[in-house]
């Protein structure tokens, strides 16, 4: 069986610069690259505001999901990278739980020393199964 890969990008310069897509679908699985806090024009959002960065990052995750006709309840796993994890863990946990409601995907949260952008405090990737009932 020969599967096709469907990719999606926001059209941001860094996608070409680093040679990646925001998400790639193979069959019923969508692999979502780490999302970060930016607006529709690629401007970074939330310098020094961890909660705003998480909320904006999750909004960008929703935008990616919509390109594949997916919903949050079809996310089966998240990977959350956080700078200053000890300081930001409670906020991370609260906002992750708020975002998913009663849905409980598998999740890995890791503290990191740096992320791609100097002011970036969080990055969230996801694994989505389109064959999971939404």
Regions found by a protein language model. Name each.
Residues 1-59, 63-76, 82-134:
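N-terminal presequence-like segments and the immediate start of the first folded domain
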């Amino acid at each position: 069986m020969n599967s096709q890969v469907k990719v999606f990008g926001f059209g941001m310069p860094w996608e070409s610069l680093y040679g990646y897509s925001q998400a790639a679908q193979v069959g019923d699985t969508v692999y979502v690259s780490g999302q970060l806090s930016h607006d529709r024009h690629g401007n970074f959002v939330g310098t020094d505001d961890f909660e705003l960065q998480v909320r904006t990052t999750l909004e960008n995750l929703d935008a990616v999901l919509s390109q594949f006709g997916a919903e949050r309840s079809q996310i089966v796993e998240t990977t959350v990278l956080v700078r200053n994890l000890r300081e930001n863990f409670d906020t991370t946990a609260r906002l992750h739980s708020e975002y998913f409601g009663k849905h409980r995907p598998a999740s890995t949260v890791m503290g990191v020393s740096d992320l791609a952008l100097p002011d970036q405090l969080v990055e969230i990737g996801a694994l989505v199964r389109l064959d999971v009932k939404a």
